[in-house]
């Protein structure tokens, strides 16, 4: 069973629908016991970094998610991916979950923001749907795929059991479903592979 973390920030219904379309058993919850029983966790997110971190703190999820990320497959989507890092410079400096070393920084001012629409992944060679103005800055060894948008923007990162997708797989049609399926089949079944 996959649990989608419900903390009041995210495109939960579409993610739930996409995972169910792949035949997954899915629950949406903020209950720590149920989240702890799940085989894998998905952290969605839409909006701004600081309010999202505040919601995680209000719901008592921060330490729990930090611990769970060392025990089971953990997928952050869009803002959920950004929250995995140590901090963001959005609206000042905001501390993140610190599950992945690295920061989240505003995309360059010489490109149109937000970065919205379809963009081709360099390694997978297929287009996925993005909506964001900030992107991760992290160790290149963890970047599974990326796009160029004013700078190199990590689109998929993976370290140990933790995976992040900056784009919205649930809004990326068949390609998004394929990438979610790859995450489920590889990351959830073996920590030695990457998507």
UniProtKB/Swiss-Prot annotation:
Keyword line: Amino-acid biosynthesis, Cytoplasm, Glutamine amidotransferase, Histidine biosynthesis, Hydrolase, Lyase
Domain of life: Bacteria
GO process annotations (BP): L-histidine biosynthetic process
Any GO MF annotation of the entry: glutaminase activity
One Pfam entry name: GATase
Catalytic activity: 5-[(5-phospho-1-deoxy-D-ribulos-1-ylimino)methylamino]-1-(5-phospho-beta-D-ribosyl)imidazole-4-carboxamide + L-glutamine = D-erythro-1-(imidazol-4-yl)glycerol 3-phosphate + 5-amino-1-(5-phospho-beta-D-ribosyl)imidazole-4-carboxamide + L-glutamate + H(+); L-glutamine + H2O = L-glutamate + NH4(+)
Subcellular location: Cytoplasm
Subunit comment: Heterodimer of HisH and HisF.
Protein function: IGPS catalyzes the conversion of PRFAR and glutamine to IGP, AICAR and glutamate. The HisH subunit catalyzes the hydrolysis of glutamine to glutamate and ammonia as part of the synthesis of IGP and AICAR. The resulting ammonia molecule is channeled to the active site of HisF.
NCBIfam families recorded: IMP_synth_hisH (TIGR01855)
Name the UniProt record assigns to this protein: Imidazole glycerol phosphate synthase subunit HisH
Gene coding for it: hisH
């Amino acid at each position: 069973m996959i649990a989608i973390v419900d903390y009041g920030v995210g495109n939960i219904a579409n993610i739930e629908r996409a995972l169910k379309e792949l035949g997954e058993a899915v629950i949406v919850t903020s209950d720590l016991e149920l989240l702890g029983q799940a085989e894998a966790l998905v952290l969605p997110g839409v909006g701004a970094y600081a309010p999202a971190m505040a919601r995680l703190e209000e719901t008592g999820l921060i330490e729990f998610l930090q611990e769970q990320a060392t025990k089971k497959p953990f997928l952050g989507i869009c803002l959920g991916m950004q929250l995995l890092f140590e901090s963001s410079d959005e609206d000042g400096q905001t501390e993140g979950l610190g599950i992945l070393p690295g920061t989240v920084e505003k995309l360059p001012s010489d490109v149109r923001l937000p970065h919205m629409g379809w963009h081709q992944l360099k390694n997978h060679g297929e287009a996925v749907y993005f909506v964001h103005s900030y992107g991760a800055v992290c160790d290149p060894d963890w970047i599974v795929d990326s796009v160029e948008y004013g700078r190199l923007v990590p689109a998929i990162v993976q370290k140990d059991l933790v995976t992040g997708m900056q784009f919205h797989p649930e809004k990326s049609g068949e390609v998004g479903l394929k990438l979610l399926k790859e995450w489920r089949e590889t990351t959830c079944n073996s920590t030695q592979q990457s998507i």
